[in-house]
Amino acid sequence: MTLAMVKQPEKTHSPSLIDGLADAELTPEICNLEYWLQAIRCSLRGYVHGHTPGLAVPRHMLEPGPLREASLQEFAFRATTEQMTARHLSHLVRTAPDQATMDFFATQLIDEARHADVFRWHLVEMGIPRATLEARMAEIVGNKRDAILRPLEQFALDLVAKPDADFIGGVIFLTVIGEGALAPAAEMSERKWRVFDPPAAEIAQGANMDEVRHLGVGAEVVRAHIERHPQERGRLPELIQRGLQLWQELPILPLLIEREMLFQAGMEQHRSLLGDYELIPGRRLADTTVEERIGLQAHWADEMRGQRLVRMGLTGLTVAG
């Protein structure tokens, strides 16, 4: 069997999540176990804990201040979400309707567990002792876990953990509602830490390369399901609407504002390090504002969701996310 149908991008010139999802035409059959083994061998080659060996956390990220606090908050939260995603995936592996789909979600489960691990390890690299890491993460994430992540987890468990598990509903949760909705923040993370914290940017880039595959295949699994079961065209959009309505009810915006305000304050302190580095073409990161970066993530969310809905065959669906 040839694996040349889809080539995993080299980490040095990998696409962004946005561009990657626009181009992705992936299936569980293409992204099988052998493909995954070769893909991670390529994308993680030479890396230790998700980044180039010897690439140290810069001194300014080790010193107390808003920039460090922004990073600690972000990576503690992301490590927690990835851990919860891995647990959700165990239900998809258990209930997958065929071998190819089961194998794919098994690889995604390992990917998400790896993401959680490298995010946690970055906190250690930033000076948090391993012995107190879990307690410190719980302190950093705080009530955000109960206010944001627990309701999402319960929404997902209501789909996949019951005896008559809704497998395709669980896939939609990951692809549109849960992991898919978090993807814009992941894209922003890779871009905004590239100068301030190169190890963090490499870690984020590696995770984002995986997410292109996860979201692309997830959309294809839903598309194929709808093709086989056209009667689901009525139920699945309603499920997406309920999930996105839940997002609107959760305190996501205050979390983003808090994180971006810390980043903004840190950026003001260390502006000279950025030079002319651009967040997006034609726009220097040093010139961006809290509102602009949050607005950009909202724009990316709409764009990426639209791409996935088109791929799923749900182009007539109107959602407010």
Annotate each PLM feature.
Residues 2-321:
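Non-heme di-metal
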